[in-house]
Amino acid sequence: MATKAAFARMNGLGNQIIVADMRGRADSITSAAAIRLASDSETAFDQIMAIHDPRTPGTDYYIAIINCDGTQAQACGNGTRCVVQALAAETGRHAFTFETRAGILTATEHDDGLISVDMGTPRFDWQDIPLAQAVADTRKIELQVGPADAPVLHSPSIASMGNPHAVFWVDKDVWSYELDKFGPLLENHPIFPERANISIAHVTSSDTIDLRTWERGAGLTRACGSAACAAAVSAARTGRTGRKVTVNVPGGPLLIEWRDDDHVMMTGPAEWEFSGTFDPATGEWSRDTQGLQGSGNADRGAA
């Protein structure tokens, strides 16, 4: 078995992704390898999307998702779009079925290059998110930042898109809040036994949401697809918007539709940056034109 595995450095609206080809191999990417790749400025990432051979009949591939701190993740919508683009460039196919820790999902690349991912159905029961204690209504829970009589943030909506999310609603620019300071505190709050993704959301019209996210295991991010989905369904659930919205994240817009069949569709772009090979055990890597390819901009790292 070859030591090195192929990879592509990509991004989904600025969400930094490494798509790793682990097909035909018995090994997995170690936490040490992930942390080493994350610490290198050229390969720094938010998530690794490791493509493995299928484990379940009817699926094309199993996708293991690894955060930049070496922990495992259940879902990554932006990373899934990157996987689709890489596989479409390789195979000529444009529709795929994947299995992740969060379940089975489907994704399609359109003629305009945008990619839609069926993110599955949202879950709202406190046990399913999960929360550490019973909450009757997850549209608004008791959690706040700041003084009790004048909280900076309070009463977030809670949802799971295969991973836990808390969405704090605000009535001014999302950039006016110090998410880098309170994000890690809220991520690790005792109410979230598996930690949580923390977002600040501002509804700017009946079909538009501005969003910033502190991503569990990754920190501040330019885009988090599952957070955009959680914000969209929570906005509809609380009467702030309809069921089809544009969510503006720092990296750009995502179109989110909460369909009548309860599935959440996310549509957005993916972009290839460069290809290489790496050692899944150590994280040692090099550029290699024979690695996974993709469409999008040229190798910006070669300039």
UniProtKB/Swiss-Prot annotation:
It is found in: Cytoplasm. GO terms for biological process: lysine biosynthetic process via diaminopimelate. Substrate binds at residues 15, 47, 67, 77-78, 163, 197, 215-216, 225-226. Coiled coil: none annotated. The active site is at residues 76, 224. Pfam families: DAP_epimerase (PF01678). It catalyses: (2S,6S)-2,6-diaminopimelate = meso-2,6-diaminopimelate. The keyword Amino-acid biosynthesis applies. The record marks 165, 215 as: Could be important to modulate the pK values of the two catalytic cysteine residues. Homodimer. This is Diaminopimelate epimerase. It comes from Brucella abortus (strain 2308). The lineage of its organism: Bacteria, Pseudomonadati, Pseudomonadota, Alphaproteobacteria, Hyphomicrobiales. The gene is dapF.
